[in-house]
Amino acid sequence: MRETATFTVPSGFDRYQNPIDPTVYKVSCVHLQADNSTHKTAQNTEVTLRGVLFVDGRYSIPQLDYEALQEAAQAAGGVISCTVTGRRGSTIGPFDVVVVDGLPDDEANLHHWELGLV
C-alpha cells in the first residue's frame, strides 16, 4: 500500500458540465489493483470495473467516509473522480468511483474500503 490517491468530489456543475468548487482529498497508503469484472452499483446497474482501489481502515491517511462522499457527489449530480500516483511518481487515471464497499473485520469494525473504478 504505497500508492497515493487523489479524490475530487464535485459540489455542482456549470452549464458546460465542469465541476464547480470541487473538494479534493489526497489519501496515502492505498493500493490499486487492475480488474476486469462486472459488478452491480447501488442504482442496480451493471458496470465493468477497470480497477479496485483498496483503502485501509487503519493505515490510510486521512480516514474518510467514502459512502458519504459518494452520496454528496451524487446529490450534486456527479461521481467521485480519482487518480492514483504510484511509488515512482507515475499517475494512473482519471477513474470514476462507481462502487463503494466498506468491509468489516472479525469484530465488526471497518477493515478496509474497496472502491470500484471505471
Which residues fall in each region the model found?
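Short, conserved turn/kink motifs that form compact alpha/beta structural patches or helix kinks used as
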Residues: 18-118
